[in-house]
Every structure is written in C-alpha cells, then in structure tokens.
C-alpha cells in the first residue's frame, strides 16, 4: 500500500480532507493531511509562501516520511512544487488535482484571471490582517457548483480567511522545471471545475501541459468534489498514484 500526503488549497485546512482520507484508509493506504502554515481559524496569518512550504517540509521530516505520493489541490500545487525542489528524495510521485503549476517566476496571482486579481487585492486591502475571505456567491457558483445549497452552506462555514502574501510571492521554480521529468507525475482534472473559467484561464490543459506529459486522470465534479463525492475522488487519487 502507499503513503499519501494530501496538501489542501486556499481557505481550507487538512481537516477538510476527512472524507477522502477515510476512503483511502479503508482501501489500506496510509494518509497524512497536514495543515499549511497560516491556514485555519484563530491562527497567525502573517506568513509568506516560504513559510507555507517550510511547514509541510517540517511535517514530512518530523514524521520521517519517505516514498510518499504528494498531492496538491489548487493553491497546494504551488506548495508541492517547492517541496519537490527541497526534498525530492522523499517523494515517489507528485499529483496535482485541479492545482496550480506556476510558470517559472510567476506568483499565484499571475496565474489567475484579472477579475480574481482585482477581487483578491480589494479583499486583502479591506481586511485588517492582509487576508482574503471567500465570498459565498463565488463559493456557491464557481467552487462547489456540483453540490446543493445545503452542502454549499455546510461547507462554507468550514472555510477560513486566506493569507494574501503567499498569493503574490514570486516562485522561480528553476529546480522544479529542471527535474520534473525525472519523477512520476499525474494531473487529476475534475471536469465541472469552473473555479478557474474554462478556456484561456482554465486548469486543463493550461496547467497540466507544464508537467511534460503527466498521467491524466479525469472525473466528473467541481473544484470541491472532495465534499460532494469523496469516494470517487479517492478512487481517482489511487489511479493517479499507481506505479
């Protein structure tokens, strides 16, 4: 069986992987769901991208994990790219699930469409701690569009404000792009995911094509299929993670 380390996206913590992690464990796998620094409620938000990466590196090293399948969702894709640069010897395969694969030197903000840039900047400036709070209409219509209203409301209360600084930090990723061809890599694409609008700014093939021929695994569902169909997502993670 395999060891999975699942890295959440923006506005989430490791706790939101509960349904997926349970399904993976029921199938015999070891699963870790650490929370990235600065994420969650009632925690310090003054972190940068390097702090976020270091928190996951520390978790992996402290738990003495090796031969791991490291998965990043959404913003978590930027984290796993950097973790791969710092600890490639601990990783067996990388998986991006509708996740960012930034172009060399780009920040996450460089990779989102202009309407999101303006919104995130305005929300961060309006906050008292340089964070971005997810507006419910965007959550309902663009992130969890495959769920009913009750599911959208129940999951929305789990979200927490997102530190803005990691969104704007530039990521050179020189070592990532120099070595990505030397490790197994997969891209999971939820086909109803419109968190990034399909087309010019969409997830696939824009992000997946940067991985130099990854294994592509697709499934029905939204950006938050972890809530709406965790069992199916777990099956697709196993498919993406197989040797």
Predicted feature descriptions by range:
Residues 2-41:
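Conserved HGGG/HGGXW glycine-rich cap/lid loop of the alpha/beta-hydrolase fold
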Residues 36-69, 85-86, 108-114:
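Active-site loop/oxyanion-hole signature of alpha/beta-hydrolase fold enzymes
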Residues 72-76, 80:
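Gly/Ala-rich beta-loop-alpha elbow adjacent to hydrolase catalytic centers
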Residues 85, 91, 95-136, 166-169:
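Flexible "cap/lid" loop of the alpha/beta hydrolase fold
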Residues 129-182:
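Conserved alpha/beta-hydrolase catalytic His-Asp/Glu region
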Residues 161-226:
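Conserved serine/cysteine hydrolase catalytic core
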Residues 227-241:
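Post-His helix in hydrolase/transferase enzymes
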């Amino acid at each position: 069986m395999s060891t999975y380390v699942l890295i959440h996206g923006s506005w989430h913590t490791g706790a939101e992987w509960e349904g997926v992690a349970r399904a993976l464990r029921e199938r015999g796998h070891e699963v870790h769901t650490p929370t990235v620094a600065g994420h969650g409620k009632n925690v310090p938000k003054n972190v940068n991208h390097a702090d976020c990466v270091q928190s996951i590196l520390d978790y992996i090293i402290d738990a003495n994990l090796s031969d791991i399948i490291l998965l990043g969702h959404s913003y978590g894709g930027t984290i796993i790219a950097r973790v791969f640069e710092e600890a490639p010897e601990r990783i067996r395969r990388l998986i991006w699930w509708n996740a960012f694969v930034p172009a060399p030197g780009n920040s996450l903000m460089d990779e989102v469409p202009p309407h999101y840039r303006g919104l995130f900047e305005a929300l961060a400036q309006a906050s008292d701690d340089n964070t971005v709070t997810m507006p419910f209409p965007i959550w309902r219509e663009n992130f969890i569009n495959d769920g009913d209203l009750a599911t959208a409301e129940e999951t929305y209360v789990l979200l927490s404000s997102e530190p803005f600084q990691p969104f704007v930090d530039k990521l050179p990723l020189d070592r990532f792009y120099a070595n990505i061809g030397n490790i197994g890599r997969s891209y999971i694409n939820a086909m109803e995911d419109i968190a990034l609008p399909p087309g010019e700014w969409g997830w696939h093939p824009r992000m997946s094509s940067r991985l130099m021929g990854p294994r592509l695994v697709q499934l029905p569902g939204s950006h938050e299929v972890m809530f709406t169909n965790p069992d199916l997502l777990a099956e697709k993670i196993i498919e993406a993670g197989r040797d």
